[in-house]
Amino acid sequence: SKRKAPQESLNEGITDFLVELANYERNVNRAIHKYNAYRKAASVIAKYPQKIKSGTEAKKLDGVGAKIAEKIDEFLTTGKLRKLEKIRNDDTSSSINFLTRVTGIGPAAARKFFDEGVRNLEDLKKIEHKLNHHQQIGLKYFEEFEKRIPRSEMQKMEALILKELDIVDPEYIGTICGSYRRGAESSGDIDILLTHPDFTSQSEKQPKLLHAVVDHLESIGFITDTLSKGDTKFMGVCQLQKEKEEEEEESLHRRIDIRLIPKDQYYCGVLYFTGSDIFNKNMRTHALEKGFTLNEYTIRPLGVTGVAGEPLLVDSEKDIFEYIQWKYREPKDRSE
């Protein structure tokens, strides 16, 4: 997601600057390893129960190295960071960072538009004819997509989606994943995982199982735009309709993704797309220690030679935890 949930923590100043540096490394320098390093440090520090007093103290945490510790010292003594000031005052990086906030514009496209003289929303509107369909929609709803979705609205959308799924075919199973499932107070977008007993990894592709749902949600006015529609993944825009005519406020347009997953791979998918990223990494590492390889599709035992065997049967998230002998964790406890 383009926007991360706000972190409430004692070390917010530190985590904020680390996330900002991370995004700069990813979007402007295309340095994904540096992005990951900053994100990891931010995540560890966000969970640290005390207010950090020095870089040395921070360096004791796993994921905080010497360079990041130095930056923390500078931030704690001066209240700011020379590197960040420089980045913020640098037109290139601030423009590129801004352009990547438009859905459909990744770092490469942002760099290309920047080289063509595009700096802001007004400039983008002038070259709208050069944008692809996805980017045009990203531009059209830019202000709305920037706003986070309150949990109360997510709950309304979840209830509507599950009710309508049941109308299309009661055999569908749907789960809203992402930070919402972990209990977050707000979300950046809606991420739905969908499955049906007729669709397994052994069966033929079943695009109609996905398209029937999308078409139905379009017909009731919930899905308003399509960004892309493949056999197993739909990306688009949705909007809650007014419950009563007299409601003044229209709901905002929101980004929605619907993924159709084979039934036998569904719970590995739900686990993966619930996150968090850090939790997933830790769980995969633990699985490897126990002799299993875990990804968003399957969990498979590793042979002595390190070759993965056949996927194990999974009928719930709990099954996956049991295979790797890990105590089950409720979604709300999966932030790390």
From Swiss-Prot:
Binding site for Na(+) 1: 59, 61, 64
Keyword annotations from UniProtKB, A to Z: Cytoplasm, DNA damage, DNA repair, DNA replication, DNA synthesis, DNA-binding, DNA-directed DNA polymerase, Lyase, Magnesium, Metal-binding, Methylation, Nucleotidyltransferase, Nucleus, Potassium, Sodium, Transferase, Ubl conjugation
Catalytic residue positions: 71
TM ranges: none
Region (DNA-binding): 182-191
Signal peptide: none
Cofactor: Mg(2+)
Binding annotation for K(+) 2: 100, 102, 105
Record-listed Mg(2+) 1 binding positions: 189, 191
Binding-site list for a 2'-deoxyribonucleoside 5'-triphosphate: 148, 179, 182, 188-189
Family membership noted in the UniProt record: Belongs to the DNA polymerase type-X family.
Binding site for K(+) 1: 59, 61, 64
Locations listed in the record: Nucleus; Cytoplasm
Function, in words: Repair polymerase that plays a key role in base-excision repair. During this process, the damaged base is excised by specific DNA glycosylases, the DNA backbone is nicked at the abasic site by an apurinic/apyrimidic (AP) endonuclease, and POLB removes 5'-deoxyribose-phosphate from the preincised AP site acting as a 5'-deoxyribose-phosphate lyase (5'-dRP lyase); through its DNA polymerase activity, it adds one nucleotide to the 3' end of the arising single-nucleotide gap.
Name of the protein: DNA polymerase beta
Keyword DNA-binding found: yes
Binding site for Na(+) 2: 100, 102, 105
Entries under Gene3D superfamilies matching the protein: 5' to 3' exonuclease, C-terminal subdomain, Beta Polymerase, domain 2, DNA polymerase beta, N-terminal domain-like, DNA polymerase, thumb domain
GO MF: 5'-deoxyribose-5-phosphate lyase activity; class I DNA-(apurinic or apyrimidinic site) endonuclease activity; DNA binding; DNA-directed DNA polymerase activity; lyase activity; metal ion binding
GO biological process, one term: DNA replication
Modification after translation, per record: Methylation by PRMT6 stimulates the polymerase activity by enhancing DNA binding and processivity.
Gene Ontology cellular component terms for the protein in this record: cytoplasm; nucleus
Name of the encoding gene: polb
The organism's taxonomic lineage, starting at the top: Eukaryota, Metazoa, Chordata, Craniata, Vertebrata
Pfam entry (one): DNA_pol_B_palm
